[in-house]
Amino acid sequence: DDLPPLYDEHENDAVPFIDPLAPTTGPGAGGLTIEPFKRDARSDTVYYLDPRLDSDPKFLNDTLVQLAQLPPRPFAQIRGTHTETRRRSDDKTEQVTVVDFDIEIELTHLLYVNIRDPVNGAWRQLHSVGNLEKVRRGTVFPTRAPGFGGSGGIIENGEPSVEEWCHRFCASRAGLKNMVFERRVTGWDWDYLKKQLERLVHDTNYRGHTSITFPVRNSRVEIYNACRVNRMRLTKWIEVMFMLTLLFVFAWPYLFFRTKRWETVYAEWAMSRDEPDGTGCVERRYASMSEAQWYQMWARAIQKAVLERRQGHLDQGDVERADQPADQAGGFAGMVQAGVEAMGVVNRSFGWGGDS
C-alpha cells in the first residue's frame, strides 16, 4: 500500500492556497464562486454570507454541490497526560497537567480510491436528512418531520431532496436564517481502532491518562442570509465588544430565538462500502485500506513516538524510520536513536507517566 503523503499547514499562508483535491471537471469544477465571510479557527467553521445564497435556490444548490467536492480532514489523535503536584514560591501546592505525548496522523488520503482523480476517485454523495432524524428544519429547536413525530406544518409526502431544502430556505420569510452543511466521514469502525490504539499505548507501560480521538476538520459550513444583524454577529470586534460590555446577555437570547436554522443537507464521504461480490453475497470494500491494515502500518511508529514523548504530526517518514534498526541510522543520529530506544526499554520495565 502507498504511504500517506506529507501534509503542510496552509491556513496562514499569505498566498491563497489552491486545494489540489478540488475537482477541475464535473459538477464541482471551477471551485466556489464566492469567498467565505469568515473562517473561525477555534470552531473550525467556515461562514458564508451572500445575498444570492438566500434568494436563489439554484445558486444555493450549486454552491452545496461545490462544497461537497471538498474533502473533510479526519485525524487520529493520541494524547497522554499526567498531573503533578508542585510547590509554589508562596509555599502552597498546585496541581499541574503535564502533556507526555500528543501526536496526530492525518487520514484524508484514505478517503480516496484514486487521489489523483478528485472527481471520481472518492465515494462521496450529497444527502438530505430523513424524516425521522431529529434536526432543525427551519426551526429553532431540533424536530422530526411533521407526521413523523414532529409538530406543525404540512405532513411530508416523502423525503425532501437537497433541491427542495434549498427552495424552502430561500422562500422562508424569516428575518434571520442559517443553513448548516456538514461533511461526514463514514465506513470505519472507530471504536475498534480506539481500543487497538489504547492497547498499544498501554503496552508501553504508560500509567498516565490516555485520550484517543478522531477529530474531523474542514467539516462544517454555515450559511447566513445577508442582513446587517448577521454581519454584526459574525464580525469579531463586535463580538468582543458585546462580551466585554455584557451586552451578550441580552443579544444571545434574541439571536437564538429569532434565527431559523436548517440542518438538513450534508455530504457523506465513505471510507468503505458494501458491494456485491458476484456470487449473490455482499462484501466490504475499502476506498484505500481497512482499519486493521492502517493499524498494522502505523503501530510501530506510533508506539515509538509515544516512548519518545513526541508532540506534533507523524508522516510517512516516521513509518520508515520505525522499521529501521538503530545501527543502520549511522553516526550521531544512530547514537541518539539507540539512546531513545534504551530509555523506552527502561520505561516499559518500570512504568512511566503516572500522577505524582
Residue map of PLM features:
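Intrinsically disordered, low-complexity regulatory segments in eukaryotic proteins
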Residues: 1-163, 167, 181, 356
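Short amphipathic alpha-helical segments
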Residues: 350-356
